Amino acid sequence: LLEDECKQKKKKMSTPNFEQLLEAGCHFGHLKRKWNPAMAPYIFMERNGIHIIDLYKTAAKLEEAAAALKNIAKSGKKVLFVATKKQAKQVVADKATSINMPYVIERWPGGMLTNFPTIRKAVKKMTNIDKMTKDGTFDNLSKRERLQITRQRAKLEKTLGSIADLNRLPSALFVIDVMKEHIAVAEANRLGIPVFAMVDTNSNPNNVDFVIPANDDASKSIELILDTVCAAMAEGIEERKAEKADAPAEGEEKDAAPKRERRRVRKADAEVEAAAEESAE
């Protein structure tokens, strides 16, 4: 039994080993002349003018980040994934959708976090257009108006469709390439929202709360890291569902206990009254 439990624990929250990280090319950094000295603790060596990332540190940091993201997902909160670079877009869209998390893969809308109410208004506009289409109001408009609204809807969908369900500020950001997404990182820093990120040797890790030192340019590297964190978050979501299913049963037991207690009290009161009557006689 203990062996089975250990195996199950190993199956859960599994992070890639050194060989898997190596195979995905997570160790390739940038040219030495492009490096950011703040990344020095995560650099293993320099080879042919290119910095090589220490994959043992990558594995440790990835495990730490995955555990923290699992807890966020388990508490029912949202993590916003941000990746507007070509090689990361589709992977991020697929992985975030699979765990029902919001994401931004087109241009980052300035003020997305710091001016969140305005962004919500734009999302509401999109919802209103959908309502118009359903209730027939849209059909009563002129051809020109319909065309304008359709174009507006398509534009909003492209930039905000993936965050339509984000009703409040996210509890964390997961960023691929902090240099490219520096505006998103700055907004999160300003609001005290934790930032998880894949950080390459040319980037500044100081504005990131959970640094995952890794190659943020190769699609295989991006996919492996995302697979790991999304699998951990999926576990957190499943655990939350399981706990919610158990909660009503516990609640029923708690309700039953006071009833039993009340019965005992009534019985004791009745016995006291009977004894009092006997002594009076």
Regions found by a protein language model. Give the residues of each.
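Intrinsically disordered, compositionally biased charged tails
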Residues: 1-15, 235-281
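N-terminal cationic and glycine-rich segments that engage phosphates or anionic surfaces
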Residues: 12-78, 84-85, 89-132, 143-146, ...
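Residue-level signature of catalytic and energy-coupling elements of molecular machines
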Residues: 25, 81, 173, 225
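Conserved beta-strand segments of the P-loop GTPase G domain that flank and frequently precede/overlap
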Residues: 53, 82, 175-177, 198, ...
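Short beta->alpha junction loops/turns
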Residues: 58, 84-85, 178, 201, ...
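Short amphipathic alpha-helical/adjacent loop interface patches that line ligand
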Residues: 66, 153, 226
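Long, charge-patterned amphipathic alpha-helical coiled-coil/hairpin "stalk" segments used as oligomerization
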Residues: 99-206
